[in-house]
């Protein structure tokens, strides 16, 4: 007999304290199929670089930052305290920490001419 129950599992790359959930590459690939992104992009919640790798594989220049150095960053910094975009960047593409997604969206809209947030649909309910 088949078990059709739905089980929720914690993402294997989740880190509770910093709300790190790596974005599946298929999500970024899907984005690239429907959006024409500028060449230079800032990923301010880069984590270990999941989004960054896909964008760079598609020849985008990506500046990667995060509040914690996971080893794949151009600089460490708190996005919510940034006063300007990195030089040359024309867009923000990120999967922000869910617990502070709303302030991330607000800050990104203040800083960038183009903002793409990869968020769970549950964000729309909050």
Describe each model-derived feature in a short phrase.
Residues 1-126:
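Class I S-adenosyl-L-methionine-dependent methyltransferase catalytic core
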């Amino acid at each position: 007999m088949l078990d059709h129950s739905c089980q929720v599992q914690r993402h294997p790359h989740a880190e509770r304290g910093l709300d790190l959930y790596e974005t599946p590459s298929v999500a970024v690939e899907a984005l690239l199929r429907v959006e024409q992104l500028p060449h230079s992009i800032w990923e301010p919640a880069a984590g270990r670089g999941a989004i960054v790798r896909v964008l760079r594989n598609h020849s985008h220049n990506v500046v990667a930052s995060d509040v914690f150095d996971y080893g794949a960053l151009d600089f460490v910094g708190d996005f919510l305290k940034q006063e300007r975009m990195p030089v040359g960047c024309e867009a923000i593409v990120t999967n922000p920490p869910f617990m502070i997604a709303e302030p991330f969206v607000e800050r990104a809209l203040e800083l960038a001419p183009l903002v793409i947030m990869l968020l769970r649909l549950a964000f729309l309910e909050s």
